[in-house]
Amino acid sequence: MKVIITVNYEEMSKKAAEIVKKQIKEKPNTVLGLATGSTPLGMYKHLIEMYKRGEIDFSNVITFNLDEYIGLSPDHPQSYHYFMFHNFFNHINIKKENVHIPNGIAEDLEEECRKYEEEIEKAGGIDLQILGIGINGHIGFNEPDESIETKTHVVTLTEKTINANKRFFKSAEEVPRKAITMGLGSIMKAKKIVLLASGKNKAEAIKETIKGQLTTKVPATVLALHHDVTIIIDKEAASLIPDEDLKEIEVIV
């Protein structure tokens, strides 16, 4: 596990975008695993700028998003379909047929989960998976006490997650109670993983992820078992990492 600490959110975002750019340069038909939420927004902004400067070509890139709310149509402003197209896909030259996001309004949700796993396998697996982290250590919508071997599945969101996401809705009541998410087992199959975190509210989860015991109570601790993980965090998210551990960590200022 490699940990990079940056001075702020902007530098964290830039570093993440550089890693994605390098991956696509090395393999133009890269399969990217993507995340939503406020954390990766800056990375998407930098990737769009790189594309506009002619530094990066997404025409052969394939993407798979981690998750989607159940019950929200793709054109709903709070759906992750809408988020990804509005904030990223509409601004680059990716082919729509190469974009994959779980269908939260599928008639048969179990079949949708099975098909999603099948599509990932058909694409050759995920080359680079981008992750955020919840304040309770969840990755994707894999909540505490999930099995570390799960594939794409339907999950019931915890009150903590609902409260954390209510800022995107008019009220907590409007936040969907269920979602489709790639499982921890699916995520761990990625060839490389980059986890991003910013802000003091993520500091406890980051401390546990980097130095804590492997436990399903903090899903991100499973990343310690992966062979190629880079964690990029700003100083605030790194604020609870013990001083003695900072010696082993790359700090970018």
Curated annotation (Swiss-Prot):
Biological or metabolic pathway of the protein: Amino-sugar metabolism; N-acetylneuraminate degradation; D-fructose 6-phosphate from N-acetylneuraminate: step 5/5
Keyword Phosphoprotein: no
GO cellular component: cytoplasm
CDD domains: GlcN6P_deaminase
GO biological process, one term: N-acetylglucosamine catabolic process
Catalytic activity field: alpha-D-glucosamine 6-phosphate + H2O = beta-D-fructose 6-phosphate + NH4(+)
EC number assigned by the record: 3.5.99.6
Any one GO MF annotation of this record: identical protein binding
InterPro entries: Glc/Gal-6P_isomerase, Glucosamine6P_isomerase, Glucosamine6P_isomerase_CS, NagB/RpiA_transferase-like
Record-annotated active site: D67, N136, H138, E143
Family listed: Belongs to the glucosamine/galactosamine-6-phosphate isomerase family. NagB subfamily.
Job of this protein: Catalyzes the reversible isomerization-deamination of glucosamine 6-phosphate (GlcN6P) to form fructose 6-phosphate (Fru6P) and ammonium ion.
Protein name: Glucosamine-6-phosphate deaminase
UniProt organism field: Thermoanaerobacter sp. (strain X514)
